[in-house]
From Swiss-Prot:
It comes from Paraburkholderia phytofirmans (strain DSM 17436 / LMG 22146 / PsJN). Keywords: Pyrimidine biosynthesis, Transferase. This is Aspartate carbamoyltransferase catalytic subunit. The keyword Thylakoid does not apply. The lineage of its organism: Bacteria, Pseudomonadati, Pseudomonadota, Betaproteobacteria, Burkholderiales. HAMAP family: Asp_carb_tr (MF_00001). Signal peptide: none annotated. Transmembrane segments: none annotated.
Length: 341
């Protein structure tokens, strides 16, 4: 990324450091009055704001069932989707969410944009701001890119982090919380297991911060030693290096894919060997609570981290996560658009 002020490079060590101590000091996503102006990370968000987002999403779920699937909340506003990394579910659901809020949505073709010709990220943002953008939805391979944009964009512009490097994916974390609340109601009595490549997963980071904020008494991280970051125990997370032990009696299972594109070297054996030790099969699912739900942020790698019988089975709520994601992203966009310094 070519910027006058560079976002930090990712590494296993820097990912662990951010996991333990946060990305930036302070909370630049809140207004002086403590309202949500940007959504950059779940870390540091007050519980009241998290619950407000989930409660607002409740109001938007029914929009999907209407004959006219629109509300006028963002009418006249321009939302720019800036996806510097490939995405299917996240970009599409953000586009649907903004459209259902009656916003004008523009998807920047990164490969054909001036950033591919050497223009800095901040120059690109300044030019788009001059076109009277009201909101930037940003996905970037560099951790911190959305923070950088939020610090330098025009005062009226709102920034939503759609995933930055290994750091955070706050709307995925929020839609995961919405899904859990929909099926389990009470966070304060749950055991939640996050399984797989947690070291490289921005979703895991956002989920852990959200779960602890909402009062989940037991969060488990399950995976090979090479794929677990340091600092988990200091966050109150129980660490397991054996899948069978970690799944015992859990109420929610969040499976993660291997983030091969973020790995700097060969950390694991073959996909078949990984599935043998860490894949969620019907037999392993039976170790969890009888009414446990299975979640996955996608994309899934069947036969690697999850068996098709589980992914398509009655305890899977994976497709519901996608559906709920639209309402949650509508809620986030609607809330931030109404808050200014």
């Amino acid at each position: 990324m070519n910027t006058a002020t560079q976002a930090p490079k990712d590494s296993a060590d820097s990912a662990t450091e951010r996991f333990r101590y946060g990305f930036l000091k302070g909370n630049p996503q809140l207004t002086k009055n403590g309202e949500l102006k940007h959504l950059l990370s779940i870390e540091g968000l007050p519980k009241a704001i998290v619950n407000h987002i989930l409660d607002t999403a409740d109001q938007f779920v029914s929009v999907t069932d209407r004959e006219v699937k629109k509300v006028p909340l963002l009418r006249g506003k321009s939302v720019f989707n800036l996806f510097f990394e490939n995405s299917t579910r996240t970009r599409t659901t953000f586009e649907i969410a903004a459209t259902r809020l009656s916003a004008d949505v523009l998807n920047l073709n990164i490969n054909a944009s001036s950033t591919s010709k050497g223009e800095s990220l901040l120059d690109t943002i300044n030019n788009l701001s001059a076109m009277h953008a009201d909101m930037f939805v940003v996905r970037h391979a560099s951790s911190g890119a959305p923070y950088l944009i939020a610090q330098h964009c025009a005062p009226h512009v709102h920034v939503i982090n759609a995933g930055d490097g290994r750091h955070a994916h706050p709307t995925q974390g929020l839609l995961d919380m919405y899904t859990i609340r929909h099926y389990k109601k009470d966070f304060t009595k749950l055991r939640v297991a996050i399984v797989g490549d947690i070291l490289h997963s921005r979703v895991a980071r956002s989920d852990i911060h959200a779960l602890t904020t909402l009062g989940v008494p037991e969060v488990r991280a399950i995976g090979p030693r090479t794929l677990l970051p340091g600092g988990l125990e200091q966050m109150g997370v129980r660490v397991f290096h054996n899948l069978d032990e970690g799944l015992k009696d859990v109420d929610v299972i969040i499976m993660l894919r291997l983030q091969n594109e973020r790995m700097s070297g060969a950390l694991l054996p073959s996909a078949q060997e990984y599935f043998k030790s860490w894949g969620l099969t019907p037999e392993r699912l039976a170790l969890a609570a009888p009414d446990a739900i299975v979640m996955h942020p996608g994309p899934m790698n069947r036969g690697v981290e999850i068996d098709s019988q589980v992914a398509d089975g009655p305890q899977s709520v994976i497709l519901n996560q996608v559906t709920f994601g639209i309402a949650v992203r509508m809620a986030v966009m609607g809330i931030v658009a109404g808050n200014h310094d």
